[in-house]
């Protein structure tokens, strides 16, 4: 009877050699775990020290043997006695009476001539028992690797030797009377085990080839990418991979402000969710958000073609006179770069198109980059922009010229010549260019030309809308229904009148008029505002009653709020008590929670757009107004990218152009809460410069200076820090704002919570707060409202799609 084959998995990690099995144990294999083709993980056994104490620390010591003396990993023999495989090392000092020596001593010496010299005895050293072999597979069956053995040089055909894995040893014993079916079954089982254990013909595990990948930054067309070798046996999930990539140069603070949270294929067609999806040699894009920015990443590492110039002062030469050459990417000094908005006038027939472009550390890395970006934005008929001049006639020759006093430029193509008339701004263009441009084309003092109120950053919706006295009348269709009372407000895009509704018991309402000069080409923006206003109906949002489109102008009938806005109220009272601030923030929080649940972002939450109301008990509240910049979030869970808002209240993710969502309204709410408590905003600039203001906003660093904040609770300071957080993922939502301890308890929190908030705020503040001198305190109080009205709020109405 042929012996029954059995797979035995014996744990040999740091164990002494087992005693010889009793006769007949080959067939049963009762003391081993049955494999049945499964790739069972080995157990780590406890080892016994010399002192007899048990240790749970596994011994994984790999012997340092030269390649020529590596031991055999598997032995196939025709001996009738079972063979338990152990690594064999040439050691004359090992005892020859060991059990392993007795088992291998009967084999001919030439069987080991590749691994053991003829003058040495084949023994098993005790040191070799500490090899990283996890298990021993004993196969009592006929020749296991006939193909591999037949190709080797075996002096004795009766005994065949082959190498197996270093993590598992396979031994076979040929028996008489073995039929073909059992032999085929044994070979199938061994082949399956080979595949699962990755046993190669050399006896060592296959080294899994690492996948060579290249990773890019989302939206960064100038980053060449980095090479990364992905070893699937070491990195088995996406989280460790992202953490490893975060340690490399790819994690740029501007391109990836929130780290790596998503990885896309290079074309953006697929988001990678498993390491198995990576393909060798492929390119992938790392992103902080789920919005993929389509850029030709594969060409980022290629040299760029540009005009060969003898020096930087002949860029105005005609294109045909210049040759093309390949240049390496230039690394210009950008220490002077700060976030600012420039206006570029497209040369041509007046009135000319005026584009606005944001410059920051990301978009102004070199002069050539700015020219390429402006070419895409301005879209000259003659092609690329080759020349730029300020309104004073000074040519723009370097990157630093964009960050001087002038912020209005005229763009020309290669074949266009500058004329003196080109530098004169027409009356139709003057409003779009901004108040910084005067008739003599020189900017006057920034503080003397800034508006008295914060103006929003809007896109091509500016223009003079204040009508003459003779024109302050409604069209005949509306004149029959409404009677004009007085002008109560004006802005960039509209004027607001108080009217009497003749058809409804002489109710007083507000009439918002958007003049025709602001309608042409902007109908979709106004229609979006109307569509949003028709969707919403909330107690703390100004209600839209009706609207008309007459004589190319829009007329909106709105709820009238007679007490004015919070900005004017703060100019009078200077600061608001905490109890009143709680009620105002509750009104604002409920309004924001309502519109955010509808997927609507206001994008222009500020003091001027919060109208003061009183309830029947005389308590103050606010209503949210002016949805001129409001937008609906994309249905595919994307983000918005249009740069808009008011400088004092704009969130850092808007300036960084990384995409944003509803949390920009929460940031603005935090700025408002800070301002109403002490009378000045958290981010301000001493000289009204855009550089200081935007730098402070993007850093997110602010303080609670004394003595202005001495009488303000620590719990509300904690709330402000949760609202004004540079990371929108860690910033409060509208619901969290309403559920804050300070809000729920109407400013009267428990002493324990107040103490906890005190410790929290002090631990999180970036810089030690300095005590204000009496003069500094006086000037901060005296100019606090000037900061609100003038701090970087020059009418740089802009909006640019990324």
Swiss-Prot record:
EC number: 2.7.11.1
Any one GO CC term of the record: nucleus
Composition bias, Polar residues: 1-13
Gene Ontology molecular function terms on file: ATP binding; microtubule binding; protein kinase activity; protein serine kinase activity; protein serine/threonine kinase activity
Subcellular localization, as worded in the UniProt entry: Cytoplasm, Cytoskeleton, Microtubule organizing center, Centrosome; Cytoplasm, Cytoskeleton, Spindle
Active site: residue positions: 604 (proton acceptor)
Pfam families listed in its UniProt record: DCX (PF03607), Pkinase (PF00069)
Residues involved in ATP binding: 488-496, 512
Bias (Pro residues): 15-24
Keyword list, A-Z: ATP-binding, Cell cycle, Cytoplasm, Cytoskeleton, Developmental protein, Kinase, Nucleotide-binding, Repeat, Serine/threonine-protein kinase, Transferase
GO annotation (BP), single: establishment of mitotic spindle localization
Region feature (Disordered): 1-102, 430-470
Catalytic activity reported: L-seryl-[protein] + ATP = O-phospho-L-seryl-[protein] + ADP + H(+); L-threonyl-[protein] + ATP = O-phospho-L-threonyl-[protein] + ADP + H(+)
Protein kinase domain ranges (all copies): 482-743
Protein purpose: Probable kinase. Kinase activity may be involved in positioning of spindle poles in meiosis and mitosis. Plays a role in spindle positioning during asymmetric division of one-cell stage embryos. Affects spindle position by promoting microtubule assembly during anaphase. Plays a role in the assembly and stability of oocyte spindle, perhaps balancing the forces in the spindle and maintaining their morphology during metaphase. Plays a role in cell division and in embryonic viability up until gastrulation.
Family: Belongs to the protein kinase superfamily. CAMK Ser/Thr protein kinase family. CaMK subfamily.
Protein name: Serine/threonine-protein kinase zyg-8
Native organism: Caenorhabditis elegans
């Amino acid at each position: 009877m042929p012996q029954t084959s059995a797979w035995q998995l014996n744990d040999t990690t740091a164990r002494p050699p087992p005693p010889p099995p009793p006769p007949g144990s080959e067939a049963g294999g009762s003391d081993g775990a049955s494999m049945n083709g499964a790739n069972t993980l080995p157990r780590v056994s406890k080892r016994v020290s010399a002192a007899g104490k048990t240790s749970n620390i596994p011994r994984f010591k790999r012997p340092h043997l030269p390649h020529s003396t590596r031991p055999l990993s598997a032995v196939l023999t025709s001996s009738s006695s079972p063979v338990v495989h152990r690594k064999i090392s040439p050691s004359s000092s090992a005892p020859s009476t060991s059990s392993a020596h007795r088992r291998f001593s009967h084999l001919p010496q030439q069987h080991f001539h590749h691994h053991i010299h003829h003058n040495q005895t084949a023994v098993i050293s005790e040191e070799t028992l500490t090899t990283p072999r996890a298990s021993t597979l004993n196969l009592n069956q006929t020749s296991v690797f006939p193909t591999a053995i037949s190709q080797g040089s075996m002096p004795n055909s009766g005994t065949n030797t082959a190498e197996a894995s270093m993590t598992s040893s396979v031994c076979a014993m040929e028996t008489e009377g073995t039929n073909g079916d059992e032999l085929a079954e044994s070979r199938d089982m061994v082949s399956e085990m080979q595949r699962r254990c990755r046993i190669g013909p050399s006896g060592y595990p296959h080294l899994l080839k690492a996948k060579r990948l290249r990773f890019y930054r989302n939206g960064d067309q100038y980053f060449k990418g980095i090479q990364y070798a992905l070893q699937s046996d070491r990195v088995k999930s996406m989280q460790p991979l992202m953490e490893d990539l975060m340690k490399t140069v790819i994690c740029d603070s501007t391109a990836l402000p929130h780290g790596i949270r998503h990885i896309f294929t290079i074309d953006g067609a697929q988001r990678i969710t498993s390491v198995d999806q990576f393909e060798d040699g492929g390119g992938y894009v790392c992103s902080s958000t789920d919005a993929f920015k389509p850029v030709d990443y594969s060409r980022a590492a290629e040299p760029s073609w540009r005009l060969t110039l003898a020096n930087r002062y002949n860029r105005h030469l005609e294109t045909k006179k210049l040759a093309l050459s390949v240049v390496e990417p230039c690394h210009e000094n950008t220490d002077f770069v700060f976030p600012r908005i420039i206006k570029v006038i497209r040369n041509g027939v007046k009135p000319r198109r005026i584009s606005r472009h944001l410059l920051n550390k990301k978009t102004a890395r070199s002069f050539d980059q700015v020219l390429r970006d402006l070419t895409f934005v301005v879209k000259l008929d003659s092609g690329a922009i080759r020349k730029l001049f300020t309104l004073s006639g000074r040519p723009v020759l370097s990157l630093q010229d964009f960050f001087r006093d002038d912020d209005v430029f005229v763009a020309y193509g290669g074949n266009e010549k500058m004329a003196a008339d080109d530098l004169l701004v027409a009356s139709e263009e003057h409003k779009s260019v901004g108040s910084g441009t005067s008739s003599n084309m020189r900017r006057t003092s920034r503080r003397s030309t800034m508006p008295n109120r914060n103006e929003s950053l809007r896109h091509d919706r500016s223009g003079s809308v204040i009508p003459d006295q003779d024109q302050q009348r409604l069209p005949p269709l509306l004149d029959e229904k409404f009677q004009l009372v007085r002008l109560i407000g004006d802005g960039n895009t509209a004027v607001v009148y108080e009217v009497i509704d003749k058809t409804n018991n002489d109710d007083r309402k507000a009439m918002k008029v958007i003049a025709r000069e602001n309608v042409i080409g902007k109908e979709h923006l106004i229609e979006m505002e109307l569509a949003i206003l028709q969707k919403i109906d909330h107690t703390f949002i100004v209600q839209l009653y009706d609207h008309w489109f007459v004589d190319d102008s829009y007329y909106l009938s709105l709820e009238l709020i007679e007490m004015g806005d919070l900005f004017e109220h703060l100019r009078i009272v200077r600061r608001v008590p905490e109890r009143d601030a709680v009620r105002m923030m509750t009104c604002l929080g409920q309004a924001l929670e309502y519109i955010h649940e509808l997927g609507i972002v206001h994008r222009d939450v500020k003091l001027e757009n919060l109208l003061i109301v009183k309830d029947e008990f005389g308590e103050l509240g606010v209503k949210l107004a002016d949805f001129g910049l409001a937008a609906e979030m994309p249905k595919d869970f994307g983000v918005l990218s249009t740069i808009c808002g008011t400088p004092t209240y704009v969130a850092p993710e808007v300036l960084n152009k990384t995409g944003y969502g509803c949390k920009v309204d929460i940031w603005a709410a935090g700025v408002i809460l800070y301002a109403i408590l002490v009378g000045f905003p958290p981010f301000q600039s001493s000289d009204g410069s855009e550089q200081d203001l935007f730098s402070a906003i993007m850093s997110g660093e602010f303080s609670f200076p004394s003595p202005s904040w001495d009488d303000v609770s620590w719990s509300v300071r904690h709330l402000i820090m949760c609202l004004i957080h540079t990371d929108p993922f860690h910033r409060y939502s509208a619901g969290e704002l309403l559920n804050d301890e300070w809000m729920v308890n109407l400013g009267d929190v428990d002493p324990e919570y107040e103490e906890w908030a005190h410790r929290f705020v002090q631990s999180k503040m970036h810089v030690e707060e300095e005590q204000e001198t009496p003069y500094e305190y006086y000037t901060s109080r005296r100019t606090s409202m000037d900061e609100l009205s003038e701090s970087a709020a020059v009418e740089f109405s802009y909006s640019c799609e990324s």
